[in-house]
Amino acid sequence: MPKIIEIPGRSGFYLRVAVPRGKLRDAFGTCDVVKKIGNTKEEAEENISSAEIAIQQKFDEKLREEDAKQINKSLPKGIRLEAIKNSNSKEPPKNIEKDLKDAGFSNAAIEALMNFDEKESTNIEEIEQTVPSPCIANNSPRAKFEQFKADSNYLNEPLHSELLNDSDHFTNDAVQLLKFHGSYQQDDREHRKRGGTGKDWQMMLRLRNPAGYVPGPLFVALDELSDRLGNQTLRATTRQCFQMHGIKKGNIKEVIGTIVKSMGSTLAACGDVNRNVMAPAAPYEQGSYPAARKLANDIADVLSPQKAEKTYIDLWVDGEMKYAIKPSSEVKKNRKLQLKPGVFSGDKKEPLYGATYLPRKFKCATTVPGDNSVDILTHDIGLVTFTNKKGVLEGCNVYVGGGMGRTHNLDTTFARIADPIGYVEGEHILELVQSILALQRDYGDRKTRRHSRLKYVLHDMGVDWFKKQLTSKYFTRQIENLKHEGDTILEDYLGWHQQSEKLWFVGLPLLSGRLTGRVKKELRNIVEKFALDVRLTPNQDLLLCNIGNYQKASVKRALINICLLYTSPSPRDQL
C-alpha cells in the first residue's frame, strides 16, 4: 500500500505509508509515515508517485473485490492493494521495493513497509501532530537551494570551474558554494564614492579558529597576507575567529592556500554546516579549562564535513592531503558512529551531513562552570564541562536551541535562549553532539531559511518532543539530570593573568575587533620576537599567550609603546 487517502488532513491530501509504531521509531521516526502530495484531491492525484503508478496500473479498475483479495495474498508482506485502476492485467506487481525506492522512500521506510502489520498502523491525525516544518524526514518540498547543494558534487561545482576563468567575480551559484569554504563575495561601494565606475568585487575570508586559538605562525601569515593581498586589516569576530577583507578573486586561492599551509583553515567557517566552535579564550592550564578547549577542538573536527574537506583540499592546496584535519582518537572513534541508524545520512561519502548538508548554520560552544564568557545559552548546542581533580572530562550539562538572530519587522523570527536537556557522561559527548546535529539535519525547515535553525524546531515542537526524538532515534545513551554549576560571571580577560606557574597571558582591547596600522604591525613583531600564540575572545579582544616570566617586562614595554597598555595601569595590570 502506498495509496491516496481520501480523507484530508488539516492541510491537504497525503500518500499514506503505514508503519508499525515501534519499528517506525527505531527505523526512521514518524515523518516518513505520511508524504503530502497535494492540497486538493485533484492535485494529489496529479502527483501520484511512480511507486503508486507502478503498482496500480497493473490492475483493472473494475476488478472484483474477490480478485483483489486473492492478489493481495501474493503481494509482499505489508503491501495491500486498496486502489485499483488503469490496467487489464491481473498479475501481481513486481519489483515493488525498487518502485518504492524510485519514488523517494528511504531504505528504512521500505524495510518497515515489508514487515507492516496493518493492525498496528497509526492514523492520520496522530501523524500530523508529529510532523514539523518542511524537512528531510517528512519528504516535504524544499527550497531550490537544497537541490543546488545536492547537485554541487560536495561543494565543488561550479566553484572549481570559475576559479580557472579570468572574471573579476564569481557567479551567484559559485558564491553560494564559496560560503562553505569560508568566504563571501562583496562589492566595495566606497569605490564608486571615490569616483570609480562599476562594481569593485572583493572577497571577505573567515577562518576557523576553535576556542579562538591562532598559532603564532598563522598570525604572522595573516598579517602578511592582509597587507599584500587584502585591505591591510584583520578583524576579530564575536565567534572568536579572524576575518580578512578586500581580497580579489584572482588572489583567493593563494590566500586560502597559504592559510592552510600555515596551520589554519577556512573550511566550514560559513555555510550550512557547523561553524567555529567557541570556548573560553583564557589559556589557563588548571581546572576544567583545558578539557573545555580540547572538547571544542574535537567537536570542530567530528562535525567537519568529510567529502567536502576533500573538495576543499583539492581546490585550495591542489589535493595535498597532508594538510587535511588530523583527528584525535576520540574523533576517529565517533566518526565511525556516524554510520549507525538514525545518525547516518544515507551517503557514505558524507555520512553525517549528506549531500545537502544542513538547512542552515549550526553553532556550538563549550565552557566551564562559573565562566559564561561564551554566552552559553545562545548556541544550538552549549556544553558546560565537568572534570575530576586531574582535569579529565567527566561529563557535560547540555543546552540546545539557542540563537540570537532575527529579521527586522518579521515576527516569525526571534531570538531564543537554549533549553537544558540534562547531563551526559564525557565519553558520550561527541556522540551526543553529532546526534543532535543529525536531528537538525532531518527536522530543520528546508523550505524557509529564516525558519530553519534548530531553535525553531525546539520552539515549534517542544523540548519533550525533541528529547523523545533524540533518545529514540539518534542517541540511546542515558541523559541524567543537570549538575549544579554555581554562580557565573561574564569575564573579559583584559589585563595580565597568570596562565600557569611559569607563564602569563595579557588581554588587549580592540575597537570592534579591528586590527590595523601600527598596532597590527607591532603585534606581529611581538608575536614573532617572543614566539607567542594568540587567542581571540567573544568580545572581539585579543590575548597574547605563553609569555614567560622572563619575557613579561619586555612584552609590557612593547605594548605600552603602541598604547595597548598604559603606564598607569589598572590593579590587575600591575601584577
Predicted regions and their residues:
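N-terminal basic/disordered segments at the start of proteins
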Residues: 132-203, 213-215
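Short glycine-/aliphatic-rich beta-strand segments at the starts of folded cytosolic domains
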Residues: 191-212, 497-513
